[in-house]
Amino acid sequence: MKVCPECGAVYDGHHWVTEPDKELLRKLAKSKKEKELCPGCLRIERQQVEGVVTLKGAFIDSHLEEVENLVRRVAKNGWHQNVAARIFEIKREGDGLVIETTDEHLAERIGKEVEKAFKGDLEFKWQKKDRFVRVSWQRE
């Protein structure tokens, strides 16, 4: 069995689990544990960004905390489904936020959830060759 030293995810021999059940915890307690970075932590270490979400407009200034909380919640839910899907960085730029993710589908989900919660204009630009997406959302 393998355990990620950064986030605590457990590899059960088939896939990485972020919240091991009692049975897996029992197996983990009895077995020899190897330390290995999970796919998400490995992508962060390699600075492997597969999605960039740009949220712009006056709405961000007046609802910054709400928007950031939603983004973090979407990322946390995504992590439970896919251990490789993480937020690499959230930074404030001008009248908006830029969120870099380690998974293109997480970036897409963040954009869709922000648009669903706060309306606005949403656009996706997928790169054909690479696994990469630019998500733009704006609301004044």
Labelled PLM ranges:
Residues 1-46:
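N-terminal cysteine/histidine-rich coordination modules
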Residues 3, 10, 72-79, 84, ...:
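Long C-terminal interaction/binding lobes of large macromolecular proteins
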Residues 15, 19, 61-63, 98, ...:
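Residues in flexible loops and secondary-structure boundaries
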Residues 17-20, 51-54, 112:
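A generic "cationic amphipathic patch" detector
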Residues 27-28, 61, 91-94, 134-138:
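Short amphipathic alpha-helical patches
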Residues 31, 46, 92, 128-130:
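Short coil/turn motifs at beta-sheet boundaries
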Residues 44-106:
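Extended interfacial segments that mediate partner engagement and assembly in macromolecular machines
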